[in-house]
C-alpha cells in the first residue's frame, strides 16, 4: 500500500475516532457500568431472574462499547507510531497495513453498533409482505420479495421461519409473515418498512408490455419476556381451519391453522405452518402481541418513526424503493437516494448498502 494512501486512511480514522468520542459520554458510561456492577452484587439480585438477565445484558453491552472504543484508540496510536518508523524502516510496512486492516474492521463493526442503538433494535423481527395494486403481477412481486428477504436473512445467519403463507390465485402470494431470529434483526430490517415498487416486462402479459406493481412490507420487533403486553382471553376470538404449506402442499386433514381476532381493536393474525393447533396458536399470539404493542407505541407521536415509520397507501407515489428491470436496471431508495444498477444482486438478498444508508440517514 502506497504511503500516501496509508496517511489518508490514518487521517480519516483519526477524524472518525473524534466523531465516535463526540457521540459518547465516556464519563457517564463509566458511571453506568459502576452502578450496574454494584447492583449485581446485591444479595437479592437474582430473585427476579428476568430482570437480572436484562441488567446483565445491559452491563455487557455497556462494557463492550467502552472497551471497544479504547481498543480503537490504542490501535490508532500504534499505527501512527508505525507510520513514523516507516520513513526509516520499510520492514514495518506489512505490520502497519495489517494493523490498519484490523482497525478498519473494528471501526466498521463499532459504527454499526452505534447505528443500532434505538429501542428494540436488538430484538428479533416479524416481517409481513402484502401485495397491493397489480393483481397477479403484484402477487408474483410479493413472492420475489419473499425470496429476497429469505436470502438476506440466511446470509446474515438469522433463523428465518414462515409463520403464515397465503398463496396467490395464479402465481405468487396473497400475503406472507416471516420471523427473523438473530442479533439486531429488527434494527436491520426496520429499513424495509414501506411500499416497494417493481417495473418490468410482465411474464403474465402475452403482449409483453411493461407493468408497474406495488407490495407493502411491514416490520415489527418480536417482544421478549421483559416487555409485557396484557391480552385478556375474553378479548380474543379464535377460529381454526385446515392449513397447508406454501403452494398448498401438505394440506392437513384436521384444523390446525389458527386465526386470532382481537375484538377491541379488530386486529387479525393467523398462523398455518405448525403441524399442531397449539403451535400455531402460540405463534399467532406472539404476532398479536407485537401488533398490539406497536399500535400502542404508535399513539405516542415521538415513537412513530422509531418503531414503524410512515404507513403509506400501496400505490403510485408512496414507494420507499423502486426496482427497475426495464428499460434499464436500477434499484433506488427514495429516502436516502442510495442506488445500484445490479438489480439481480439485490434480489438475491444483497441489501447491506441500502440498510447501511438508511441507518445513517435516520440519525442524520
From Swiss-Prot:
Record bears the keyword Cell cycle: no
**Location relative to the cell:** Cytoplasm
Quote the InterPro entries the UniProt record gives.
Answer: PCRF, Pep_chain_release_fac_I, Pep_chain_release_fac_I_sf, PrfB
Q: Which residues carry this modification: N5-methylglutamine?
A: 249
Entry annotated with the keyword Cytoplasm = yes
Q: Give the GO molecular function terms.
A: translation release factor activity, codon specific
Taken from the UniProt entry, a GO cellular component term is:
cytoplasm
The UniProt keyword set, sorted, is:
Cytoplasm, Methylation, Protein biosynthesis
Modification comment? Methylated by PrmC. Methylation increases the termination efficiency of RF2.
The protein's matches in Pfam families, at most eight in alphabetical order, are given as:
PCRF (PF03462), RF-1 (PF00472)
Q: Which family does it belong to?
A: Belongs to the prokaryotic/mitochondrial release factor family.
The entry's function note states: Peptide chain release factor 2 directs the termination of translation in response to the peptide chain termination codons UGA and UAA.
Name this polypeptide is given: Peptide chain release factor 2
Upper taxonomic lineage: Bacteria, Bacillati, Bacillota, Bacilli, Lactobacillales
Amino acid at each position: 500500500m502506497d504511503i500516501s494512501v496509508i496517511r489518508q486512511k490514518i487521517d480519516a480514522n483519526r477524524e472518525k475516532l473524534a466523531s465516535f468520542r463526540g457521540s459518547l459520554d465516556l464519563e457517564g458510561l463509566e458511571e453506568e457500568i459502576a452502578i450496574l456492577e454494584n447492583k449485581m452484587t446485591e444479595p437479592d439480585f437474582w430473585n427476579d431472574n428476568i430482570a437480572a438477565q436484562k441488567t446483565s445484558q445491559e452491563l455487557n453491552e455497556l462494557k463492550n462499547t467502552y472497551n471497544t472504543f479504547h481498543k480503537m484508540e490504542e490501535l490508532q496510536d500504534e499505527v501512527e507510531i508505525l507510520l513514523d518508523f516507516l520513513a526509516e524502516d520499510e520492514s514495518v510496512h506489512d505490520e502497519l497495513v495489517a494493523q490498519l486492516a484490523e482497525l478498519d474492521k473494528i471501526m466498521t463493526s463499532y459504527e454499526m453498533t452505534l447505528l443500532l442503538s434505538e429501542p428494540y433494535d436488538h430484538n428479533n423481527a416479524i416481517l409481513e409482505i402484502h401485495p397491493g395494486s397489480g393483481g397477479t403481477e403484484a402477487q408474483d412481486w410479493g413472492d420475489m420479495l419473499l425470496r429476497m428477504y429469505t436470502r438476506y436473512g440466511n446470509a446474515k445467519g438469522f433463523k428465518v421461519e414462515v409463520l403464515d403463507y397465503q398463496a396467490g390465485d395464479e402465481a405468487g402470494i396473497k400475503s406472507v409473515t416471516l420471523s427473523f431470529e438473530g442479533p439486531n434483526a429488527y434494527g436491520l430490517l426496520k429499513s424495509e418498512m414501506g411500499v416497494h415498487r417493481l417495473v418490468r416486462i410482465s411474464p403474465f402479459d402475452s403482449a409483453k408490455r411493461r407493468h408497474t406493481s406495488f407490495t407493502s412490507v411491514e416490520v415489527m420487533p418480536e417482544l421478549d419476556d421483559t416487555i409485557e403486553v396484557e391480552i385478556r382471553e375474553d378479548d380474543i376470538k379464535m377460529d381454526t381451519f385446515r392449513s397447508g404449506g406454501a403452494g398448498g402442499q401438505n394440506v392437513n386433514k384436521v384444523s390446525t391453522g389458527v386465526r386470532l381476532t382481537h375484538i377491541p381493536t379488530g386486529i387479525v393474525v393467523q398462523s398455518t405452518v405448525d403441524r399442531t393447533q397449539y403451535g400455531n396458536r402460540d405463534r399467532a399470539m406472539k404476532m398479536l402481541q407485537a401488533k398490539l404493542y406497536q399500535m400502542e407505541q404508535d399513539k405516542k407521536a415521538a415513537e412513530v418513526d422509531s418503531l414503524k415509520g410512515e404507513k403509506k397507501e400501496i400505490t403510485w407515489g408512496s414507494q420507499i424503493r423502486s426496482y427497475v428491470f426495464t428499460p434499464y436496471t436500477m434499484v433506488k431508495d427514495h429516502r436516502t437516494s442510495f442506488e445500484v444498477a445490479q438489480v439481480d444482486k439485490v434480489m438475491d438478498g444483497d441489501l447491506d448498502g441500502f440498510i447501511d444508508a438508511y441507518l445513517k440517514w435516520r440519525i442524520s
